[in-house]
Amino acid sequence: MIYDILQTIGSTPVVKLNSIASHLECNMFAKLELFNPGGSVKDRIAFEMIDCAEKSGTIKPGDTLIEATSGNTGIGLALGAAVKGYKLIIVMPEKMSMEKELTIKALGAEIIRTRTEAEYDDPDSNFSIAKKLNSEIPNSHILDQWENECNPDCHHDNTAQEILDDFGTDLDMVVMGVGTGGTITGVGKRLKKEIPGIQIIGADPYGSILGGGDEVHSYHVEGIGYDFFPKIFDSSVVDKFVKVNDKDSFETARSLIKDEGLLIGGSCGAATFAALEAAKSLKKGQNCLVILPDGVRNYMRKFISDDWMKENDLI
């Protein structure tokens, strides 16, 4: 018996990619985080951050939670806030999809949009606006996925354990997109302890500095890559970064939908493109896992639309 929706977070399935990776010698698998109740990997950390704050006495029902997010953490927090009785304000850049905003509002949270081009320390950025609101609203708290150690700890203890349960030590490479860095830091550290020689690969959009390079510019893929290094991100865990552009990200995502039947989001295309590149070095019988962070629900008017792709010179 499941007594509330938060108990369904985690234990997401792993499936073999039979079409898109058929040219590779190795086996390629995908962990489908869209099966979480809010639709993404961020449900994991949203629940964990709320749970940690409750156990420490930092927050109590009726308080206001505030978070700067690209959307999926906002949905996860809105889910938790709805179940547990918190007010929630999500501060999100304008670039992020309308579907994310509508989902967050449906769960009862408030949305504030900020300029996409505003850099991390700009007074108009979603980070700065969240801090300003926190200083003005009594009994408000920023859980702060960018600095909260519950983020990588959750992936170290739970996500990585699920991977070990599925593969044991028979896994040679894991590929993930990098946003806050929580998933790759937590999963990477745990798997490197348990599986000697495993390669941890990060997917990073052109325009982000996380995977190298100092040229910061806008891009369409949501939820990965930034113009600053989050405090919780331990880049030493990453063996290699693969830089990915919007065109390759979205074309790969569309292929995953059409050829594999996986209704995934745009950054899943970036991670899979990186996996297909990195896994060229693997041999027959070796195994590569790519973590696909969310589903297509948040992007129904974006990359799956031919018109949107044409408007943005991507096809």
Regions found by a protein language model. Give the residues of each.
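PLP-dependent amino-acid enzyme catalytic core
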Residues: M1-I315
